[in-house]
């Protein structure tokens, strides 16, 4: 109890510093999270036997590498650094990898004696496309030991096996019929030529899911010597027609050229051929200019010394011998500068309006939108969206340029300033996944419309009732006022003329005199009655 199972994947994660060092030696950069995702989720889907826990089996790694380097839509150029690092760990294993590395089978120098090869028939029939006539010898001819495989049999793979040795020149056999001398051209001459090997390889059935070249420009053989194989015209044609131009999508074409530089290890002439095929004349001049700007001096800073620039990145064919370590170092440095020139020349002038124009589509997932947004940052700005210092700017662009419903909910998140870009993407994914379907949206709109109509009818009825009640109250008040006035008029009319005696004063109500003779009534001239002042239009 308490024991844990060690797998190749967990082993690489425990020694991640060594893995990064191996990747740096291959001139590539890798990330731990992407490493785990490819090993446990992506490569097992290639159906080549890759386990989810990883493996150091070179055969399985080669199959995955073929899938990754496939040209066209089936390739995965973004996975090149990771499979190259896996291959480097298996080819040159550190001490902690050696217990997990599968032992290499011994090289087969005598293919006829291998159990996988069929026995040679007594009267072999020549292949249909053979370049040499098939010569048969009599049955009583002494059998001659063969070093190279039969021309009709399977060939040794130039990628996975060491090249077969050439046949030592020696005296001809002492057979009287001279049959061996007749057979020698058939057995030795065709196999000793790389071109014949290529022509014979074309007669073999094609390997499934392999659309990239299997003959790399520089390939080290078993004797330590490098073999040179130039690019084939079909590879150059496929690379040019299955990828956008450098002006349309510089990032994609740069990734393709980077994978070619890492895996094929081209020479100076091959690099010029590759650039001349994939780039226009103006684009090539821009790339070369940016590459020469990237040359650094002894102090590690970009230099302006013409001699240092020409030594590191010459414009004319240099005398670099790839069979020497010094020549290979020059080629590695040249390819690194060329890659830097491609990256710098692919950067467009800063145009933040282009970045702000990237908005999330109606049915686009937040992850896909974030990738398009990062690509716009790489293409139209000098900023790296993967830089931690630019995470805040990318996060704000992600919020403001998301779909309206997602952006509003992201803006209302609590403690928004402390949220990382990954947190925002996860929240956006939750909101995106909870979106209603078109049918649900139509049903919701119909239900809301019905509820709105019902509320409007109820409000109209309520207003009508309130208006009727108010009118009824006003009429009631008016009737009450009229009735009370009539009552007052009747009562007032009766009290208006009180009964007086014949000798009673109407003014002081005393008897003995009348009102005109009342001593209490004031005497004097009557003044004019005050007249009400009226306003005229002039006032």
UniProtKB/Swiss-Prot annotation:
Alphabetized InterPro entries for the sequence: G_retro_matrix, G_retro_matrix_sf, Gag_p12, Gag_P30, Retrov_capsid_N, Retroviral_Gag-Pol_poly, Retrovr_matrix, Znf_CCHC
A Pfam match: zf-CCHC
Biased composition (Pro residues): 111-127
Residues with the Phosphoserine modification: 193
Composition bias, Basic and acidic residues: 435-467, 487-520
Keyword Coiled coil listed: yes
SUPFAM superfamilies the record matches: Retroviral matrix proteins, Retrovirus capsid protein, N-terminal core domain, Retrovirus zinc finger-like domains
Motif LYPX(n)L motif, chain ranges: 131-135
Coiled-coil features, chain-numbered ranges: 439-479
Stretches for region Interaction with host UBE2I: 431-436
Any one Gene Ontology BP term: viral budding via host ESCRT complex
UniProt name for this protein: Gag polyprotein
Region listing for Interaction with host PIAS4, in residue ranges: 346-394
Post-translational note: RNA-binding phosphoprotein p12 is phosphorylated on serine residues.
Disordered: annotated span: 111-222, 435-539
GO cellular component, one term: host cell plasma membrane
Site (Cleavage): 132-133, 216-217, 479-480
Keywords: Capsid protein, Coiled coil, Host cell membrane, Host cytoplasm, Host endosome, Host membrane, Host-virus interaction, Lipoprotein, Membrane, Metal-binding, Myristate, Phosphoprotein, RNA-binding, Ubl conjugation, Viral budding, Viral budding via the host ESCRT complexes, Viral matrix protein, Viral nucleoprotein, Viral release from host cell, Virion, Zinc, Zinc-finger
Residues spanned by motif PTAP/PSAP motif: 112-115
């Amino acid at each position: 109890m308490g024991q844990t199972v060690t797998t190749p994947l967990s082993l690489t994660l425990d020694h991640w510093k060594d893995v990064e060092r191996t990747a740096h030696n291959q001139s590539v950069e890798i990330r731990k999270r992407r490493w785990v995702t490819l090993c446990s989720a992506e490569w097992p889907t290639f159906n080549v036997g890759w386990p989810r826990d990883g493996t150091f089996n070179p055969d399985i790694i080669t199959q995955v590498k073929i899938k990754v380097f496939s040209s066209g839509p089936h390739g995965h150029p973004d996975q090149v650094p990771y499979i190259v690092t896996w291959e480097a760990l298996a080819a040159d294993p550190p001490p902690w990898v050696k217990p997990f590395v599968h032992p290499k089978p011994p090289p087969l120098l005598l293919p006829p004696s291998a159990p996988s090869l069929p026995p040679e028939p007594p009267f072999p029939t020549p292949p249909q496309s053979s370049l040499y006539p098939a010569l048969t010898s009599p049955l009583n001819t002494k059998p001659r030991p063969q070093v190279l495989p039969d021309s009709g049999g399977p060939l040794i793979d130039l990628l996975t096996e060491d090249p077969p040795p050439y046949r030592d020149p020696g005296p001809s056999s002492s057979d009287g019929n001279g049959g061996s001398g007749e057979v020698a051209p058939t057995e030795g001459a065709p196999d000793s030529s790389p071109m014949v090997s290529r022509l014979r390889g074309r007669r073999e059935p094609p390997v499934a899911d392999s659309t990239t070249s299997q003959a790399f420009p520089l390939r080290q053989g078993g004797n330590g010597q490098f073999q040179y194989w130039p690019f084939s015209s079909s590879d150059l044609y496929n690379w040019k027609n299955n990828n956008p131009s450098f002006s349309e999508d510089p990032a994609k074409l740069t990734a393709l050229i980077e994978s070619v530089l890492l895996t094929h290890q081209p020479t100076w002439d091959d690099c010029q051929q590759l650039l001349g095929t994939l780039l226009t004349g103006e684009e090539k001049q821009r790339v070369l200019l940016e590459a020469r700007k990237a040359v650094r001096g002894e102090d590690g800073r970009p230099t302006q010394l013409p001699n240092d620039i020409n030594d590191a990145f010459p414009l004319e064919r240099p005398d670099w011998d790839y069979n020497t370590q010094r020549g290979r170092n020059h080629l590695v440095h040249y390819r690194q500068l060329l890659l830097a020139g491609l990256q710098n020349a692919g950067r467009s002038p800063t145009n933040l309006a282009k970045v702000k124009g990237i908005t999330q589509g109606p049915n686009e997932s937040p992850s896909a939108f974030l990738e398009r947004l990062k690509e716009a940052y790489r293409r139209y700005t000098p900023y790296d969206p993967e830089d931690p210092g630019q995470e805040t700017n990318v996060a704000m662009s992600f919020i403001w340029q998301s779909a309206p419903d997602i952006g509003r909910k992201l803006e209302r998140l609590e403690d928004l300033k402390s949220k990382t870009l990954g947190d925002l993407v996860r929240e956006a994914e939750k909101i995106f996944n909870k979106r209603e379907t078109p049918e649900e949206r139509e049903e919701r709109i119909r239900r809301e419309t019905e509820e709105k109509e019902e509320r409007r009818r109820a409000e109209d009825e309520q207003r009508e009732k309130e208006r009727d009640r108010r009118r009824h109250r006003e009429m009631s008040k008016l009737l009450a006022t009229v009735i009370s006035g009539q009552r007052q008029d009747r009562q007032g009319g009766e009290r208006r003329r009180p009964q007086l005696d014949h000798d009673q004063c109407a003014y002081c109500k005393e008897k003995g005199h009348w009102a005109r003779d009342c001593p209490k009534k004031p005497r004097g001239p009557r003044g004019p009655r005050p007249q009400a002042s009226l306003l005229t239009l002039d006032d």
